[in-house]
Amino acid sequence: MTAASPAKGLIALLRLPYWLMTGGLSVLTAFAITKTMIAPQTILLIFFSMAFITSAGFAINDYFDRESDAVIKPKRPIPAGTLSLKQVVAVSGVLFALGLVMAALINWFSFAIIAVDSLLLLVYSYMVKRKSGFAANILVGILTGTAFMYGQATITSPATVNLVSLSLYPIAFGTIGGNVLRDILSVDGDSKVGYPTLPQKIGRVSAAKVGALFFMLTGLLAPLPYFIGNFTIYYLPLILLWSVLLIYASIRLVTSASTVQNVRKYERIVTMSMILLPLALIAEAVLGGLL
């Protein structure tokens, strides 16, 4: 083991790209809702509180997945030997604590959301993932949706959540669909370690249709914040383009052969098109305040 191995293991454990998906999404939601400047310290607290909780969840999940990862994901920090079990648990505990403290510094409702997220992440890692793969997919979608609620809770006074962030929540359905497709692509490896994923229970063809349903729902409901009057017209162009791509992918998943190649193709389309969501929120935050 090289001296750099623990550092590399820590970086791998944190899953840094997901910080943009959680902390970044919360910050963009806050800006899109308020359409004004937010204090720099509040921005940092929003971003890192959600990001740290996300990494804490990944770390504790790696701890509980250590035996299966040794078989299907041997490069993960624990099976690769770059981090010990005690180190992984310590990192997870520290990150959970930091995330909760930062949320508490914003307001009580932000703390409550982060606390519930933390509990759900522990339940997911310890129990749900091994009992029901599809229930795990649903839970991940629920957790993703809380990023929108968190974004609003951090900038409203008194702290609250209403139709503004709740109208964004259905966007999280796309996360569920994406995880179902990824389960299809990893069905051989999951079967080796006994993960009861949806494709193993109902087959790849039916699972692809389930994933397509969630993409269709996301595509149809993504423009909702505009149509109920919460967001301005500037949110609409990019989000409608994303909706079209999601609906196209969902239709093709149902009408084309559910081969691994096709599933991978449409999963990539959906994944790459997700950049349109933060861009739409940026457009709303920057241009929406002009109306």
Where do the language-model regions lie?
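Intramembrane alpha-helical segments
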Residues: 2-12, 78-159, 251
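Extended hydrophobic alpha-helices typical of membrane-associated regions
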Residues: 2-8, 224-291
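Select subsegments of transmembrane alpha-helices in polytopic membrane proteins
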Residues: 12-21, 84-93, 135-140, 205-215, ...
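Membrane-embedded alpha-helical segments that form the functional core of polytopic membrane enzymes
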Residues: 22-64, 96-104, 110-122, 159-181
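Small-residue-rich segments of transmembrane alpha-helices in multi-pass membrane proteins
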Residues: 22-29, 79, 138-154, 199-204, ...
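Hydrophobic core of alpha-helical transmembrane segments in multi-pass integral membrane proteins
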Residues: 25-30, 93-102, 117-122, 216-224, ...
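Membrane-interface helix-boundary motifs at transmembrane edges
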Residues: 37, 129-132, 157-159, 186, ...
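Multi-pass membrane catalytic core of lipid/isoprenoid biosynthesis enzymes
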Residues: 48, 66-115, 195-231
